[in-house]
């Protein structure tokens, strides 16, 4: 069966490839001038390309799909691919021609004057999406950017790749810059690796998607060179509502309150529903390559051997799985009433019944007041996310202040202050084989539940003894019951983070501007990894690991810039500056093993 499935996958892939062809063309403006860096994306997907310096593109598509062509400052255009192999597109000018992009070191440039690809994602595409992670809200919105989750649990880490895998051992994630200051978005690895099942969140979580004004993704090397080594993997610029004064309120003061509720359902593998556990169509309380058919009219009692008791029109009945648990102290006297009883051999849909619908509630408040000489903004956000995996949850609170003003002496000042509290808990998720977690350090809830045979009543069988030990259907009790894992093992994080900026700028004359910006980012993180004794996977004698970490990053930047608009088509810009960055880290950890009594965690 395994080899048949692999063959079918390759066969279907080949059939899909034959249905595709390559479409080429040029994307230009109304005057016929090519648009370098324009985005061409297959509608409804994350697949796409960008045009080269001459506006040329080439993309493999199927007939009948829609291609969306877009470029900053122009109206997007959607075209259905017919039988043609060439599509030349002329984009009309939109209402964003005067839009500026905050580029390296906080410099504002008109989007059309840039010599590299920039993709802008507005707040309307980020807000109220039921996703607490800013990086995940960008999924499918930026061509060429690959965004993946480390796991499917709520609050787990996110990987963002712009330029492909440029490093084998180092990070491939781009630099995130929030309101002009580099922002630490790493996934903490102090507590262990994903291979060991430590499911850390990313610090993208400390940003509130509902407080973001826009996101600019800088892809080209020229766009990121001013950030040096930090920008080697690309740069993602985030402008928050607290840090942006570019959109004054017509009413003077605006208050926006919003709430959203989303339900999440797991997407599970496709399971067959005709056969139970066994080997070569012979019944057994284990899994290998499939036991007898569930239909009594098809199977033969001889397939069940000594397990067989009786059958009726609907089911075959066998001896209870706990009749065969080798360690009788797990069964007797506690579950002695089950010994000798009959057990229906049927499809229990244990995997599907293990998960519950997840529920995400998000509430946000934004107050904005602006006038002739400045603005003030306050934001508040709260996310309560109950994951569909048992005992997985995310609680997040964000609060932010920001403002800008022009003083009488002409000096412009601005500042932001943000606080984030993130509380994240999940069962451990280690890499797994059919026999359980590959890690000697921890267990794996997905590994244990996904390999459950269809004939095992996962949600009906007892899963824990009175003294706290895991019990499951296999005679050797050598796989940990995932229900036991959900209640007795966890990874948890509690993060308190304060970050903000202060900036000042002064126009020496019409061409020269002197500017200074200070940024601070302080993160305090307490992490726990725990499992009660009595399990099977990982550390069966119990483990409790904790780590305390404090990371502080301070950034100072000074710039002297020159800007002269020579005529309607030509401008001259120059910049000289200095940047200083200081990062401090302190941490400690403890590991406690060989738990003396059951059930203390």
Model-found features: residue ranges?
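Surface-exposed loop/interface segments of Gram-negative outer-membrane beta-barrel transport/assembly proteins
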Residues: 112, 172-173, 245-344, 387-392, ...
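N-terminal capping/interface segment
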Residues: 6, 105-107, 346, 503-513, ...
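Short, solvent-exposed loop/edge-beta patches enriched in aromatic
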Residues: 369-374, 407-409, 504-513, 568
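Alpha-helical support elements that line or immediately flank enzyme active sites
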Residues: 193-195, 500-506, 520-522
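Acidic-histidine catalytic/liganding microenvironments
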Residues: 142, 509, 596
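Short, small/polar-rich motifs associated with maturation and membrane association
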Residues: 1-8, 15-400, 404-407, 412-414, ...
């Amino acid at each position: 069966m395994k080899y048949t499935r692999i063959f079918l996958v390759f066969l279907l892939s080949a059939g899909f490839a034959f249905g595709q062809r390559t479409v080429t063309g040029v994307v230009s403006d109304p005057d016929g001038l090519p648009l370098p860096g324009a985005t061409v994306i297959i509608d409804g997907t994350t697949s796409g390309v960008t045009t080269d310096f001459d506006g040329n593109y080439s993309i493999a598509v199927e007939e009948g799909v829609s291609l969306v062509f877009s470029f900053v400052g122009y109206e997007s255009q959607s075209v259905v691919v017919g039988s043609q192999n060439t599509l030349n597109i002329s984009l009309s000018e939109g209402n964003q021609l005067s839009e500026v992009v905050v580029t390296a070191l906080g410099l504002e440039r008109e989007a059309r004057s840039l010599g590299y690809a920039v993709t802008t994602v507005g707040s309307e595409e980020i807000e109220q999406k039921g996703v607490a992670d800013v990086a995940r809200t960008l999924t499918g919105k930026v061509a060429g950017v690959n965004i993946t989750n480390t796991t499917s649990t709520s609050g787990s880490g996110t990987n963002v790749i712009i330029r492909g895998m440029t490093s084998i051992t180092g990070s491939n994630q781009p630099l995130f810059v929030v309101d002009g200051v580099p922002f630490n978005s790493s996934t903490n690895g102090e507590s262990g690796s994903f291979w060991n099942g430590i499911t850390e969140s990313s610090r993208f979580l400390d940003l509130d998607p509902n407080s973001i004004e826009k996101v600019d993704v800088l892809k080209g090397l020229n766009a990121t060179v001013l950030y040096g080594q930090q920008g080697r993997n690309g740069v993602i610029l985030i402008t928050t509502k607290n840090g942006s004064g570019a959109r004054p309120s017509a009413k003077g003061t605006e208050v926006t309150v919003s709430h959203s509720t989303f339900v999440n359902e797991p997407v599970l593998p496709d399971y067959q529903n005709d056969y139970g556990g066994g080997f070569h169509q012979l019944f057994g309380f284990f899994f290998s390559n499939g036991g007898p058919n569930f239909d009594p009219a098809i199977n033969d009692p001889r397939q069940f051997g000594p397990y067989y008791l009786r059958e009726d029109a609907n089911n075959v009945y066998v001896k209870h799985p706990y009749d065969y648990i080798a360690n009788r102290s797990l069964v007797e006297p506690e579950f002695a009433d089950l010994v000798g009883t009959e057990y229906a051999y049927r499809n229990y849909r244990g995997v599907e019944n293990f998960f519950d619908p997840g529920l995400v509630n998000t509430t946000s408040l934004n107050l904005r007041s602006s006038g002739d000489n400045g603005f003030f903004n306050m934001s508040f956000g709260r996310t309560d996310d109950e994951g569909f995996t048992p005992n997985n949850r995310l609680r997040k609170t964000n609060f932010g202040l920001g403002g800008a003003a022009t003083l009488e002496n002409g000096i412009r000042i601005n500042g932001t202050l943000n606080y984030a509290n993130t509380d994240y808990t999940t069962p451990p998720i280690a890499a797994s084989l059919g026999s359980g977690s590959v890690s000697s350090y921890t267990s794996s809830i997905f590994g244990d539940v996904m390999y459950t045979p269809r004939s095992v009543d996962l949600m009906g069988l007892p899963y824990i003894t009175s003294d706290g030990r895991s019990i499951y259907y296999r005679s050797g009790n050598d796989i940990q019951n995932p229900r036991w894992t959900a209640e007795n093992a966890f990874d948890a994080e509690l993060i308190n983070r304060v970050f903000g900026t202060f900036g000042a700028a002064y126009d020496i004359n019409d061409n020269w501007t002197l500017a200074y910006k200070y940024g601070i980012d302080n993160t305090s993180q307490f992490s726990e990894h725990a499992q009660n004794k009595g399990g099977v996977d990982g550390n069966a004698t119990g483990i409790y690991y904790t780590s305390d970490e404090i990371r502080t990053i301070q950034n100072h930047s000074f710039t002297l810039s020159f800007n002269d608009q020579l005529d309607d088509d030509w401008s001259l810009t120059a910049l000289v500056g200095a940047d200083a960055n200081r990062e401090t880290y302190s941490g400690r950890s403890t590991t406690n093993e060989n738990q003396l009594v059951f059930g203390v965690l």
